[in-house]
Amino acid sequence: MPVKVYAEEMEGESMKKKKLSETPLPKIKKRKMKNGDTEDLDLEHMAESVNGEINNNNPTPKLKKKKKPAPISDLSETAEECDGEQPDPSTPTPKKVKKKKIKESKEDSDTQEEAEQSEPQTNGVKSVKKSKKNITSDDNEPAPKKRKTDTTEITTAKECEEKVLTKEEQDINQEKIDGDFSKFPLSKETIKNLQAKGVSYLFPIQSKTFHTAYSGKDVVVQARTGTGKTFSFAIPLVEKLNEDQQPLARGRAPRVIILTPTRELAIQITNEIRSITKKLKVSCFYGGTPYQQQVFAIKDGIDFLVGTPGRVRDLVQNYRLDLTTLKHVVLDEVDMMFDMGFSEQVEEILSVRYKADPEENPQTLLFSATCPDWMYNMAKKYMRKQFEKIDLIGHRSQKAATTVEHLAIECTRSQKAAVLGDLVQVYSGSHGKTIIFCDSKLEAHTLATSCGSLKQSAKSLHGDLQQKEREVVLKGFRQGTFEVLIATNVAARGLDIPEVDLVVLYSAPKEADAYVHRSGRTGRAGRTGVCISLYEPWERHYLRNVERSTGITFKRVGVPSLLNVAKSSSADAIKSLDTVPADVIEHFKEYAQELIEQKGALTAIAAALAHISGATSIKQRSLLNMEAGCDTITLKSSVPIHSLSYAWQSIKEQLGDDVDSKIHRMCLLKDSMGVCFDVRSENLESMQERWTDTKQWQFTVATELPAIQESERNFDGPRNRGFGGRGRRPFDRRNNSRNSNRGGGGRGRNRNGGFRRGR
């Protein structure tokens, strides 16, 4: 009866364990802990005591020599050495025996199997296993087990962290995999030139369009600005021309023509193509430059011709520019090209090479950030029937750049120039690059020459400048000669100016497409940027139209607070101190010591930072409408309110009935949990002294504009501009007869046709 014998042995060993548990182990543990030993050493001593009891209290010297605790997995070997017996190789470890004991409690067949396997074991091993179990129950959790569990937890935490990091970088890693150079038929020379420019893989737009363009198919590509559209057609066409191995004879006609709407974009594309090929001849033709140099280029021979429609057409008509051998035609920024009235010029240029049968026409590639329906209809006119559409934006996704934060600030026209300096200082700093877009040339010139709030150097860029002047301005801006570029729409499309931190639209964006391109001057090539739109109260509907068309959401913010301006100015001032040479500092230490003795170290340094940053006079402004000398107050309620009159009543109860003349522009918060209003800075202190917060109302000075409910007033036009309400009957100013379409007066409000004088 092996099972019965095993059970009796178990009972005997259990009695021994009970006796051992009565030994004064806790005292030994307390003494050892007092001497600075760990709980692991107690475990060792207890194992020795157990083995000594089993082996007539003769512990093995080996255990006394050990300073480090033995792991639980090695406890059986230690016990066997204590018993003075040689370990049997066939003997399983206590861990395995423990598993067999668990099986014993499940089924009788398992119990029989376990008993047969346990018969060859010595009594000493069994005793040690049971003693270990008793130790575990007495000391709750042995230290080695805790260490093992903690290690597992740490490993799991590291694995989770690695998973999170992998998820964040998954998109970038996938782009690198998809754009790996080995997946494309690129020559060694092209790869070398790309790597010299810091390009280690093709961007998504480049990888997705390469094979289509390389195979000779017609394609229409829509992608956001700043995603690398130039290389998406330049790289495959360079490889195609290199494969042709056509003799590069003098006077050869161009095989590729690239038409762009602006001169600046043409120059940029030319430089990009030249950077990846040294063998092929790339020429750039645009207006505002002498014809002679361009005629010499035609006689010398051209492979890539980049130009604007007007100048290219003139060269075709008057200087024998041969386009009959064109194999590839690229139209970049197609929507803008046709919006600017270049459609007739483009058709004249293409008619030289395009035939009635589309299959005989050259490969046509259209690229744009926006692709309206009319553009697809135009594509059918020049392209083969089986042309491809590659849309990297989609109809439902955001069409503007995703790396740009879109902000909107409401202020009147008279206040825009005054707050412009603070916006540039906070969002770009003294050393960042900013582009300010204006609607007119006069406005751009005026801001560049007489905007007193701008501390940074600024220059204007508009159509009245000669081409040479425009190139000098753009070159200076790229090289950091000045920090602020004030431009008209000439700089809105296609220009790849690196590291632009801020874009400011001096007026509300009227068209969604124009906003997409203007805001796309920042946040390029993986960088982040900010685009701020300044709008007047009556221009809110323009923002809503842009939001609906592009899928973005403007974040309504106020002008930077006094604290934010001081913080940004101080950061720039501290940064500028690093540029002062050490030998120069030595000459100023004596005067610095005198200043510290006079004013104190803290006051002296603060005054120096303010002067260095140019922030000697910082005006507090309203966050609601940018009016100087006003503070914005937030009065938060513990319960929702739906009427301003309720807030007025509570304010008058504490501050008196005359307070209504001191509070301006009150409006409800967006969540209806309070109101927001302006007070004059000279009245703020007295209000704070008289006001006492209650359970319902909390009075705070706002440091940033809270989300407020937009008022619908003034949506029918500018306030006090002389436009009436309901009447729409025209009139003539000279004879007061209603036969002109310029008016529209309010019926019964003014006898002079509805045009009222501003109050």
From Swiss-Prot:
Q: Which Pfam families match?
A: DEAD, GUCT, Helicase_C
Looking at the record, the residues that make up the Helicase C-terminal domain are 422-566
The principal localisation class reads: nucleus
Q: Which SUPFAM superfamilies match?
A: P-loop containing nucleoside triphosphate hydrolases (SSF52540), RNA-binding domain, RBD (SSF54928)
- On whether Transcription is a keyword of this UniProt record, the answer is yes
Q: Where in the cell is it found?
A: Nucleus, Nucleolus; Nucleus, Nucleoplasm; Cytoplasm, Cytosol; Mitochondrion
Reaction(s) the record says it catalyses: ATP + H2O = ADP + phosphate + H(+)
Instruction: Give me the ranges of the annotated region Disordered.
Output: 1-154, 709-759
| Free-text function comment from the UniProt entry | RNA helicase that acts as a sensor of the transcriptional status of both RNA polymerase (Pol) I and II: promotes ribosomal RNA (rRNA) processing and transcription from polymerase II (Pol II). Binds various RNAs, such as rRNAs, snoRNAs, 7SK and, at lower extent, mRNAs. In the nucleolus, localizes to rDNA locus, where it directly binds rRNAs and snoRNAs, and promotes rRNA transcription, processing and modification. Required for rRNA 2'-O-methylation, possibly by promoting the recruitment of late-acting snoRNAs SNORD56 and SNORD58 with pre-ribosomal complexes.
Which named protein is this? Nucleolar RNA helicase 2-A
Q: Give the organism, scientific name.
A: Xenopus laevis
Its taxonomic path starts at: Eukaryota, Metazoa, Chordata, Craniata, Vertebrata
Gene coding for it: ddx21-a
